[in-house]
Swiss-Prot record:
It catalyses: tRNA(Lys) + L-lysine + ATP = L-lysyl-tRNA(Lys) + AMP + diphosphate. Keywords: Aminoacyl-tRNA synthetase, ATP-binding, Cytoplasm, Ligase, Magnesium, Metal-binding, Nucleotide-binding, Protein biosynthesis. Its main location: cytoplasm. The keyword Aminoacyl-tRNA synthetase applies. Its EC number is 6.1.1.6. The gene is lysS. GO terms for molecular function: ATP binding; lysine-tRNA ligase activity; magnesium ion binding; tRNA binding. The keyword Magnesium applies. Binds 3 Mg(2+) ions per subunit. It comes from Legionella pneumophila (strain Paris). This is Lysine--tRNA ligase. It holds the Pfam family tRNA_anti-codon.
Amino acid sequence: MSEEHVHLDESEVYHIRKQKLAELRTSGFNFPNTFRREHLADALLKQYSETEKQTLEQKHVKVSVAGRIVLRRIMGKASFFHIQDVSGRIQVYLRSNDLPDVYEQFKHWDLGDIVGVQGELFKTNTGELTINAEYVELLTKSLRPLPDKFHGLADQELKYRKRYVDLIANEDSRKTFLIRSHLIKAFREFMDDNHFLEVETPMMHPIPGGALARPFVTHHNTLDMTMYLRIAPELYLKRLVVGGFERVYEINRNFRNEGISTRHNPEFTMLEFYQAYADYNDLMNFTEQLFHYLCDKVLATRQIEYQGQVIDFNKPFERLSVKEAILKYHPDIKAQQLETLEGCRTLLNDLGLPYKETDGLGKLQIILFEETVEHQLFQPTFITEYPTEISPLARRSDTNPEVTDRFEFFIAGREIANGFSELNDAEDQAERFRKQVEEKDAGDLEAMHFDSDYIEALEYGLPPTAGEGIGIDRLVMLFTNSQSIRDVILFPHLRQ
């Protein structure tokens, strides 16, 4: 029975295919692993698509390909079918006269089965590059049907839960994750070319630190101690700068026990790097160069369409302080209103934005910025002069100790990167840790712990340093025009 021409539910198809597999086993089929592929579909198409039909016949090009059957047309004593590999699809022509035994078996194979094919390239009368099959072998029997006659998964959540099916059925999904891979490779190339050393730091920390976030908690049985999945590698990377590795970077996972949204996943990938004898201005310049490189290398353009609008990486990236950004996007607000607790509270009350009575001036300014301005920063924009109150690891500004030499980098209304001149004064850092502990004791679950070992490392001397973290998942969203972070993470977290 051919399921392609009869409407069957998935359980019926599964049962029929199980029977087919049982019959195959009795004839000696054992999921063979001796076929060796020598060519990819896309490479063959690129090399021979423009070759004239007669010229191709004269060349007698022999190929060996393998992939999944995704389309087939059985026409009496001859059939066409398409196989799909990681690079794309190519057509195969199989004749009963050439391979009578295989052809009889082929009629009972199904969409989704994986085959190996050897043969000679030719072009059909319509000009399609095709393999004239001289050898065909079933390599894997597929027991479950491809979705929706191979037009893709309609259920968005099912795409996330069964990514393996999504990747089979959805070319756009495959392209998304290929771009992700190319992007990470380009990050590494740029960092290596700029003399940064790639390192690996612990994923389980005895003390959570490096960011304001709620950690995942676990327990080390042998050591009998509480451990935390890392929320950021920052403090370990800066220890390495203390140790003499003056330019370091790491691409790895961070874990934050927080909400899930179109922009947040509890497990996410970041590039984090540190450079001695540099400040946050140097890093902003470096970031512009980095993004130019990424655009050129991965997309071959510096203008990217995202959700119907164009992001222009060619223009100099705008730089605004937190206060300047608020005033730019709120022309009705006076600068003096941002300078007092009373003024900021009034603004937040008028806008219906909640805050705590214990929030300081800097925190109130940030609430106003994040809730009303951030989403409007569509073109690449650096926001600088973050309040010291919310920047416990950043160096204070020499001109205004209430703010830090820190920036956040925004594109399409979301934070893509965070960087600053590092605080290398051990006594100042210890005092800020103490304030964080006070906030934690007062109920702030995201406040930092006091890391005495990190303070000791600073006491050995951290050179003037700047560091930055870049969210790779969010950047992949931009480069692939994806609306949700779940579209760019292979296996995102979902409710059971």
